[in-house]
């Protein structure tokens, strides 16, 4: 897992060069946007259970067969596993947002996820839909457009952070499908 600083150092070291130029400017911007980044992560984690439960509910509303006998969310145990997986995915998305780097998401969450879901018979289209609902909710909390906010968000334009979290959710969807 690399954070924004480690990534710059590793890249500079690989080139046998000092950290400078555009890398240094990118780090300055990363630091300047630090409070927005922390507030964005806080917005996600403070609303995580709502984000995940809404995503799973939305997925089920669109595919009621999931809760019918034989469906992948039928029985409390399977529903709990679905909610747990959503929480884990969202947690790693928040880690990636905090670090400013997707490697923690890729290495510790997405690596082998599709194969696991296939082996368990989890319908990928429903999982992708749940992730897209989580993406929309996370972006709404970051951009302060969510209707049920629990906390205030940072002042200023957070569209870059919203785009960043959206890209992490897109990575999850791509890894599952």
Swiss-Prot record:
One of its GO terms (biological process) is photosynthesis. It is found in: Plastid, Chloroplast thylakoid membrane. It is a peripheral membrane protein. InterPro entries: Globin-like_sf, Phycobilisome_asu/bsu, Phycobilisome_asu/bsu_sf. Pfam families: Phycobilisome. GO terms for cellular component: chloroplast thylakoid membrane; phycobilisome. (2R,3E)-phycoerythrobilin 2 binds at residue 158. Contains two covalently linked phycoerythrobilin chromophores and one covalently linked phycourobilin chromophore. Keywords: Antenna complex, Bile pigment, Chloroplast, Chromophore, Electron transport, Membrane, Methylation, Photosynthesis, Phycobilisome, Plastid, Thylakoid, Transport. (2R,3E)-phycoerythrobilin 1 binds at residue 82. Its main location: plastid. The modification N4-methylasparagine is found at residue 72. Phycourobilin binds at residues 50, 61. PANTHER family: C-PHYCOCYANIN BETA SUBUNIT, PHYCOBILISOME 32.1 KDA LINKER POLYPEPTIDE, PHYCOCYANIN-ASSOCIATED, ROD 2-RELATED. Belongs to the phycobiliprotein family. Light-harvesting photosynthetic bile pigment-protein from the phycobiliprotein complex. Heterodimer of an alpha and a beta chain. This is R-phycoerythrin beta chain. It comes from Pyropia tenera (Nori). The gene is cpeB.
